[in-house]
Each structure stands twice: as structure tokens, then as C-alpha cells.
């Protein structure tokens, strides 16, 4: 039977137990488990006098992969705003931290820009880049300031057999904290013995201290199938692919039941997202869409490389079409950022993809000149004319010079000069292979 007073007493005891004032970091996803955890911590600390509450930093960290289910992202963002406002009004020590992947780690930059195939269980390149790295960076930055940190997680043993085994593997008998994989970091799972039924019982009976309605959360769950999206800080923690509220682009699972259910329950504006996700799923294992040579230049029977240039351009086109479609109902929603579009073009240049341009695809769909600059285009035309005059006897020389200039420019824009000489050498070798008979 759920004993709320016991759980709150445990939290208060742990709050006072530490002499070194190490920070608390609460993993918050907006789902049922992390909501219950934050409510318990909030109500426990609120019983202290104001000066005691401020004795340690308490962070509420929420990671946005930038490809979250948009319905859930909108809900979570509103909740985080309420938490920030209520914490300030009530004199609580909570600080909301929103983390996102670095530009070079975003989903679209890797899939469209570098041509990485849609993730599967064998090549799940997304989890570390989108989830683990942003959260880990914040935790390590916090540890460097406070010496140590305690990571409070809403994980429960009855969520899955694997989760239970992992929790028991690291816990110590008679101790609340267990060593985390990150240095000087401890994990604390106050809800580890709480059942799913008890979570719902608590949320129905205990009002949100930041003024939200838990019934809104229940409505979200009633429109899809169960599970929660945990804070992912290591590869042993199941990512959202096996839970209900995951990334809308996730192809690790065969079918996105949550998005399908949301569409069936009236969120028809999300249909373009589901169709795009299904396109990624069918393209993953076909050499029609993927190169036969890998990015490192090796070629082996039974193995495939990145997406072919034409399909990368096709995916970008479909992403932008989906964005145009959903903005009819949700005008503030964006599936891909302007920074990602610019970076994708740079990566295409680095992969010697010159037949497709991001700006052409964007402007065709949105009937816009947003990504064009008249002065820049005029300068490029003048440079092209000069190059044509100088290299009028050899069109191959023009292509080589353009390719090498683009490679150098891409390195400067990405602030990564490492590998420039190798890229230039590869370009020269490819050029010589074409003109020198073997």
C-alpha cells in the first residue's frame, strides 16, 4: 500500500543528511512517474522554513531531443513554465533546466546531412546524441561546481523486468543511494517500489503544487498506450522507443502506437508526421535508398552505407512539406531549424553533393526567397564567370576547384579544421582517378 508520508519523510531525511550540500537533479519528462516524483520532493521541501529550503540547489532537468512528440512537448513546456512561476512565488529552490542536443548531434543533421539511416536496435545512433549527451553535460557541469550530485529518478521496478534487474544490480542494501555511471554522481529512486496503480492513485488524490491539473496528464495517457519517457543518462536505461511518449521519428519500434492513437482521437494534424516516420522505417534496409559503400570508403557484401544523395534531398523535402502542413493547425510548430538547414547544406558539400541545394528545396515548398541573398548570388555569378574564363579548356578543373573551395568553407563554418587536408586529398584522388587512365 502506498505510504506517502513515509516517502516524504525519506526525502526530507536525505535532504538533511548531506553535509556537503551536493546538488539534487530531478529528471523530469512530464510523464506520470516524474510528475509524482517532483510533487513528492516539492511537498517534502515545502515543509521546511524558507532559509532551510535554500540550503542546496535543486534542478528540474528536462531534455528536448528536438524530435519529441509535438503534443507531449507542448504539454511539458507549459508544465515547466508553471513550475518556474510557482517556485518563484512559493520561495522554492527549484530551477528548471531545459537541455537540447548540440547542432552537430541533431537528428536531421545526421540523417539528412550525413545520410545516417533511420535508427534500429543494431545501429541506434540517436540515443547517445539526442538524450545521453545533453543530460550528461549538464550533470558533469553541476558536479564540477558542487563536487557531487544526486540524480533523483522516477524509475520503478515494476515498469519492466530489465529495469528491475538494473536497479537491483547497483543498489546497496540499507542505502537509498547507488553509484551512478557518471563520476561523483549518485542515483536515488524514491519510487522504485511504487506500482503503476499507486502512481495513478497518488496523482488523482494529491493536487499539483505548481497549479497544473493532473487530469490533463491522465487525458494524454488515455489517448494512447502506457509507459513513461525516462531521463536517459546511460545506455542501460530504456529510451522512449519502448515507452509511450517517444520521439515521433523513432523507427526502433515497428509501429508508433502513441501517435496513431492520438490521430485516432482527433489529432489528425499529426498525420503528416506519421507518414514521414513510416517512410523512414521502410527506407532503412534498402540499397535502393542507401549507398553500397560506407562513409569510410569501405565496401562489403551485406553491408550498406549512408542514404543516397537523392533520398537525403527527398527526406528534406518531405520534412518541409510536413512542416508546411502542420503549421496550418499549429503555426508556431517547426520540425527543423534554420541552423540545421544551413548545416545540412555544408555537410552535403563535404560529401560532394552539389546537384541538390537546401535553399532550392526550401524555396520551392514555401514559395520564399528566405534562404537567398541577391548580393551573394551576384558575387557567385561573377566568380563563376571568372573561373569559366580561366579554365575554359577544362570543365573538370572548374568542378575540382569548386569542390575544394566548398570543403574549406564547410570546415570554417563548422569550426572544425581537423580533417581538412584528408578531405582535400580525397577530392584530388577522386579527380585524378577520372582523368588519368589506369
Question: PLM ranges: what are they?
Answer:
Residues 1-25, 32-438:
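Nucleotide-activated chemistry modules centered on ATP-dependent adenylation/adenylyltransferase
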Amino acid at each position: 500500500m502506498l505510504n506517502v508520508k513515509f516517502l516524504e519523510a525519506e526525502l526530507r531525511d536525505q535532504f538533511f543528511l548531506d553535509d556537503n550540500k551536493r546538488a539534487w537533479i530531478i529528471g523530469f519528462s512530464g510523464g506520470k512517474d516524474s510528475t509524482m516524483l517532483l510533487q513528492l520532493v516539492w511537498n517534502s521541501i515545502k515543509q521546511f522554513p524558507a532559509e532551510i529550503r535554500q540550503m542546496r540547489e535543486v534542478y528540474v532537468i528536462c531534455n528536448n531531443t528536438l524530435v519529441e512528440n509535438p503534443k507531449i512537448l507542448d504539454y511539458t513546456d507549459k508544465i515547466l513554465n508553471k513550475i518556474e512561476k510557482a517556485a518563484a512565488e512559493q520561495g522554492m529552490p527549484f530551477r528548471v533546466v531545459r537541455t537540447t542536443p548540440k547542432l552537430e548531434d541533431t537528428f536531421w543533421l545526421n540523417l539528412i546531412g550525413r545520410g545516417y539511416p533511420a535508427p534500429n536496435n543494431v545501429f541506434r545512433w540517436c540515443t547517445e546524441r539526442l538524450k545521453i549527451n545533453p543530460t550528461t553535460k549538464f550533470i558533469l557541469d553541476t558536479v564540477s561546481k558542487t563536487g557531487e550530485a544526486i540524480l533523483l529518478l522516477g524509475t520503478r521496478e515494476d515498469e519492466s523486468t530489465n529495469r528491475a534487474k538494473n536497479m537491483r544490480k547497483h543498489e546497496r542494501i540499507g542505502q537509498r543511494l547507488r553509484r551512478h555511471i557518471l563520476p561523483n554522481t549518485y542515483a536515488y529512486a524514491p519510487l522504485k517500489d511504487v506500482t503503476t496503480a499507486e502512481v495513478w492513485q497518488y496523482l488523482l488524490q494529491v493536487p499539483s503544487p505548481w497549479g497544473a491539473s493532473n487530469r490533463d496528464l491522465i487525458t494524454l495517457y488515455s489517448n494512447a498506450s502506457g509507459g513513461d519517457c525516462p531521463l536517459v543518462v546511460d545506455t542501460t536505461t530504456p529510451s522512449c522507443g519502448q515507452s509511450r511518449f517517444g520521439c515521433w521519428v523513432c523507427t526502433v519500434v515497428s509501429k508508433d502506437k502513441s501517435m496513431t492513437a492520438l490521430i485516432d482521437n482527433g489529432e489528425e494534424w499529426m498525420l503528416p508526421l506519421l507518414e514521414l516516420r513510416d517512410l523512414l522505417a521502410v527506407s532503412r534496409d534498402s540499397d535502393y535508398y542507401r549507398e553500397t559503400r560506407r562513409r569510410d570508403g569501405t565496401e562489403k557484401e551485406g553491408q550498406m552505407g549512408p542514404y543516397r544523395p537523392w533520398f537525403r534531398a527527398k527526406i528534406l523535402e518531405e520534412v518541409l512539406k510536413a512542416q508546411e502542413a502542420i503549421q496550418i493547425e499549429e503555426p508556431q510548430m517547426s520540425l527543423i531549424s534554420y541552423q540545421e538547414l544551413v548545416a545540412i547544406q555544408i555537410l552535403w558539400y563535404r560529401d560532394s553533393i552539389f546537384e541538390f541545394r537546401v535553399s532550392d528545396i526550401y524555396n520551392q515548398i514555401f514559395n520564399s526567397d528566405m534562404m537567398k541573398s541577391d548580393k551573394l548570388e551576384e558575387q557567385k555569378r561573377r566568380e563563376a564567370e571568372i573561373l569559366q574564363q580561366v579554365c575554359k579548356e577544362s570543365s573538370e578543373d572548374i568542378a575540382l576547384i569548386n569542390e575544394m573551395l566548398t570543403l574549406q568553407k564547410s570546415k570554417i563554418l563548422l569550426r572544425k579544421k581537423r580533417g581538412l587536408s584528408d578531405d582535400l586529398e580525397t577530392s584530388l584522388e577522386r579527380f585524378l582517378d577520372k582523368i588519368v587512365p589506369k
